[in-house]
């Protein structure tokens, strides 16, 4: 059901006329209100939700209300057929976990940079303008050097990563977090979890019908563990079900854009034990490979 969370926020004077974004790292479908007026709604469940506050929200105090509903906002099949929602493991929790922030962003139009998929050169400089959320002034520019390449392919019966033949010894992760009832959101927690996996010789984790948060990828990048997120689905791909197909496609795009730059992000699946329209599945794969 729906739960309403509220807090009085204070917009600093030096944020005047600058774009302010509400960042919700992991939650359920939400509806955001400022001073009683609806800003927008969002149903992203695999990635952060971001709300650009209206320009009329001036510096000073305002009432921020967030309605979180774990019983509506996503296709019916997702509730009982994915570990993103299942009561069997992490539970169908209600709330907002991880980071909850008001961020001063640079340019709304230039929050990311892209390089052609599959193109690897010995040296590339990619300017990321506003790509990292910042509380700095709106005109600030971040320039980062990306000194790694990511290539993962098959030759014969073997996997190769950046030219090296590898063997994947993996485990299944169904979002089992019995002590909290929701996924771990800290890098420290994931370092412990993935570090334990490595102690047992495991170098690959498959996330059954769900996607872990940013902290998991950061920890895996550091430890050298390969991660395989999945769309939050376990069932039939039915091209006639436009609501389901639109939702899953958007979740896939979100996952790739949010986490696909991580070295540890090496594979992605459309869900668990799927059946149905094979051509529709191929269409999804073709679309995702272009990102």
Where are these regions (language model features)?
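Accessory beta-strand-rich segments of carbohydrate-active enzymes
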Residues: 1-107, 174, 213-214, 223-228
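Short intrinsically disordered coil segments
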Residues: 23, 81, 113-115, 145, ...
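Residue-level structural signal for beta-strand termini and adjacent loop
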Residues: 42-44, 147, 171-172, 271
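Extended acidic/polar, glycine-enriched regions
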Residues: 55-63, 117, 136-155
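Active-site mouth of glycoside hydrolases
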Residues: 73-75, 88-90, 154-291
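Low-complexity, Pro/Ser/Thr- and charge-rich linker/hinge segments at domain boundaries
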Residues: 88-99, 106-113, 145-161
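Intrinsic disorder/low-complexity segments
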Residues: 107-144
